Design a protein with these regions (language model features):
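Small-residue-rich anion-binding loops in enzyme active sites
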Residues: 30-109, 184-219
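Charged, compositionally biased N-terminal leader segments and the immediate start
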Residues: 1-28, 312-314, 323, 332, ...
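Single conserved hydrophobic/aromatic residue that forms the stacking wall/gate
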Residues: 474-485
Length: 486
């Protein structure tokens, strides 16, 4: 059966998976969602014996039904190969009484690699399937990790160009170096004097500019996105939650059918939405625990049903979560509104014009699978420090947010279900914050000296991505947030 996609802001018009991947954002500004989330057509017993690549095919074939088996397997095998520093792609590590799903073993040492390694292949295949002759210009706003992963994925891919916008001073030093040292004739990096929300809003405005689109089309170009608003980013993220459950089963950490909780450090809401889709596909997930940092707009939303971005934007040690407008939440809003596009438009208009909206009591019922929590900067430091002291395991700042929220949830609710924590970035990406949390004395050392020190204390070898930035040249541009980014 051919699974079609529709916009969250117009339920009448449908497109194929490949068309949704190519467009990125719907013409009406909405996000593409499947008409219905498909069920897995293989059992967990079968999945537990599968490799990551085989699991990816089992999941993606249910969503990307207009791809042939040969096309999809080619995309998967081209993505999940030696670019990852472990054959299992996404290892599960038991840390104390939780299970960390390490999603940072790809080329840019962050979870974005899990989807951005395959997106260029999905996009080029989609272009071929739809007889697209234009070059595809990828526009991406980043709060840190997406930028480098997208640049690495699309670098020198024929028929594409990529422009990444990031907030100057709003990403870690390592994240910035990774982006501005990216090689590739078709890559551009622009720093804006503003925050991530400014960058993301600017990119969305470009997508919605019909005159600009027509002008570019006449010159042989068309826009698409590598942000998680693109369904081609979201679906590959579903895979690792299915894979993780199957591996827990294979390792006899859980019984068949046993429910687990999943905690995800959350900013733009894509990663936790992927876990929600995995649950809808049939993975026995009980609670989806949404972990926020001091920018706790999502925590407040789950507590009250009110989404309010009218608040101070706080720069934290987990910059990929420093977001006040969580774009992917719109997909969940559309779902809990009973796929009512008119209601979605009403709420998104309120968000754009007033910065706030409130969902109905009936919609709030649809959030019962979700729990919100947040960690302060001090709690992040304590979690990194205490986990290292007790177990020897070193985690990055974003993962520490999730680990703290997971532990707090267990303490508050006495829920004894096993908990999976999405470990979203290598500690090497946030080396100063991580090392000074372990011991404040490290603050006196320079970043590259800290990298060597982290290797000693963690036992994690220095990743190639970090070795590369030591010997690369920088290239970047800067924009004020009020300047047009077109």
């Amino acid at each position: 059966m051919n699974l079609l996609y529709k916009s969250t802001r117009n339920s009448d018009k449908t497109v194929t998976a490949s068309q949704a991947i190519l467009k990125g954002l719907a013409d009406d500004g909405g996000l593409f969602v499947p008409v219905s989330v498909p069920k897995l057509d293989v059992t967990m017993d079968e999945l537990k014996d599968m490799s990551y690549q085989e699991t990816a095919y089992a999941v993606m074939k249910q969503f990307f039904t207009d791809f042939t088996e040969e096309e999809l397997k080619h995309c998967i095998n081209s993505a999940y190969d030696s670019k990852f520093d472990t054959e299992v792609i996404a290892p599960l590590v038991k840390v104390g009484d939780t299970y960390h799903l390490e999603l940072f073993h790809g080329a840019t040492i962050a979870f974005k690699d899990m989807a951005l390694s395959i997106l260029p292949h999905l996009m080029i295949t989609s272009a071929r399937k739809n007889q697209v002759k234009n070059d595809i210009v990828i526009l991406t706003a980043t709060s840190g990790d997406t930028g480098k992963a997208a640049l690495a994925g699309f670098a020198d891919v024929p028929g594409t160009k990529i422009i990444v916008f990031y907030p100057k001073g709003g990403v870690s030093h390592v994240q910035e170096l990774q982006m501005v040292t990216q090689k590739g004739e078709n890559t551009s990096v622009v720093a804006i004097h503003g925050n991530f929300d400014n960058a993301q809003s600017g990119v969305k405005a470009i997508f919605e500019d019909k005159e600009l689109a027509a002008e570019l089309d006449a010159k042989g170009y068309q826009f698409s996105s590598a942000n998680s608003i693109n369904i081609g980013r979201l679906v590959p993220q579903v895979v690792y939650y299915v894979y993780a459950y199957a591996k827990l089963l294979e390792n006899e950490e859980i019984q068949a059918g046993e429910e687990i909780n999943v905690t995800v450090p959350t900013g733009n809401f894509g990663n936790i939405l992927a876990a929600y889709y995995a649950k809808q596909m049939g993975v026995p997930i009980a609670k989806l625990i949404c972990a926020s940092n001091d920018n706790k707009v999502l925590f407040d939303f789950f507590q009250t049903g009110v989404y309010d971005r009218n608040r101070e934007f706080i720069l934290t040690s987990s910059p990929s979560m420093d977001i006040l407008i969580s774009s992917n939440l719109e997909r969940l809003i559309y779902t809990i509104a009973g796929q009512d596009a008119q209601k979605d438009v009403e709420l998104m208009t309120q968000l754009k014009e007033k910065g706030v909206y409130e969902i109905t009591a009936e919609m709030k019922e649809g959030l019962k699978d979700f729990v919100g929590g947040f960690a302060t900067e001090e709690e992040v430091k304590e979690t990194i420090h205490d986990t290292y002291q007790k177990t020897g395991y070193v985690m990055d700042t974003h993962t520490a947010v999730a680990a703290h929220v997971c532990a707090q949830y267990r303490k508050d609710t006495k829920d004894e279900k096993k908990c999976l924590v999405a470990s979203t970035a290598s500690p090497y990406k946030f080396v100063r914050n991580v090392m000074t949390a372990i011991d404040p004395k490290y603050d006196e050392m320079e970043d590259f000296a800290l990298i060597d020190e982290l290797e000693k204390v963690s036992g994690f070898p220095i990743p190639n991505a970090i070795k590369e930035i030591r010997r690369s040249e920088e290239h970047t541009s800067e924009l004020q947030s009020h300047e047009p980014i077109s």
